[in-house]
């Protein structure tokens, strides 16, 4: 028999979905702080914690984000998820490559020349993604809806300029948070279906499904 905590966690994982239709009702400060504090529990290489979060609350701040990322009136008029723009909170997770290069130049790591070739994959983005996932799961546990979405390359400069993001930090996307209306249409992508376990898990040796 599963322990109560395990059952509750499985329920959070099962209920986790991308919400695209939000009420404009504000998120209580203590609830938002819980989401952000849990993000700090994310693992990071060398305990670098090379992530940061730009938090935009309320219509005045969120409108500034949409004005530089979704300023085409024609696109807005035909947008399939207009109530996405009603989300009362946007969190932009940012990663710092330099923080990792500096951390691994310290004596206990010994990569003193700060060479990028030491890194087989960009752990600064991966670790920030871990933090983002903890926010998504905490949102479910707190009764909120959440959506992780990308910021197109052509909009990054505008986001940096609008909110004063330092060059050392790279936005990896954005998270919309708020109370779900319960009325969003499912993404057409879901028609693809979820892959079965045997299609993605290779035990002991790579094998074709």
Where are these regions (language model features)?
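Short, Lys/Arg-enriched N-terminal segments with co-localized hydrophobic residues
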Residues: 1-6, 123
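Small-aliphatic-rich amphipathic alpha-helix that forms the alpha element of a beta-alpha
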Residues: 35, 39-40, 91, 111-161
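Glycine-rich phosphate/pyrophosphate-binding beta-alpha loops
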Residues: 40-47
């Amino acid at each position: 028999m599963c322990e109560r905590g395990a059952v509750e966690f499985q329920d959070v994982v099962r209920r986790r979905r991308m919400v695209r239709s939000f009420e404009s009702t504000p998120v209580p400060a203590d609830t938002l702080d819980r989401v952000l504090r849990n993000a700090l529990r994310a693992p990071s290489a060398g305990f670098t914690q090379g992530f940061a979060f730009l938090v935009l609350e309320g219509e005045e701040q969120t409108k500034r984000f949409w004005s530089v990322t979704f300023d085409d009136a024609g696109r807005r008029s035909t947008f399939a998820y207009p109530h996405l723009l009603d989300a009362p909170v946007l969190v932009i997770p940012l990663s710092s490559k330099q923080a990792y290069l500096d951390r691994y130049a310290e004596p206990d790591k010994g990569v003193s020349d700060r060479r990028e070739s030491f890194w087989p994959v960009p752990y600064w983005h991966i670790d920030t993604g871990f933090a983002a996932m903890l926010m998504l799961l905490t949102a479910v546990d707190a009764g909120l809806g959440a959506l992780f979405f990308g910021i197109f390359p052509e909009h990054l400069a505008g986001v940096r300029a609008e909110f004063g993001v330092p060059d050392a930090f790279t936005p990896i996307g954005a998270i919309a948070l708020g109370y779900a209306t319960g009325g969003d249409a499912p993404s057409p992508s879901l028609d693809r279906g979820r892959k079965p376990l045997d299609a993605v898990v290779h035990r002991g040796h790579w094998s074709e499904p």
